[in-house]
Amino acid sequence: MSFPFSIPQDMKVIVGLAPQHGALLTSDYVSLKTAHKAWVCVVANQGNGAQMVISLEQSPLVSGVGHIPIVSPVPIWLCEDADTSDALVEQTAAISLTLTVGLTKKLVIFEVDPALLTAGYDVLSCVTAASHADNQTC
């Protein structure tokens, strides 16, 4: 018997960032006011060897006004080459992840407990930086 769980029925799934090229990208700001847990999934298709830094920011408003980096480390998983493997390897808990320079498609998952966000900051976004315009992220 399968476990009675369905992602579309038991979770709120959103696309916070449409696939696009760019060196500095910020996703939508998503309210976690009623969430028990959030997973931020990032696909990075590196077309250039520049290292990409992926981080999470918190804000008191869905407009993003007053945003600051998260301060509590969160669990992170990484698939270094999603074209050849589906293995997600747990990384050291952190507030950001710097990807390697390999020209591969990478999958990164951040697991966020909204209770660990700064008091009054219940909105989350994902930011990519230190990248290159040839790198595609979603």
Enumerate the language-model features and the residues they cover.
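Surface-exposed, low-hydrophobicity beta-strand/loop segments enriched in small/polar/acidic residues
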Residues: 1-138
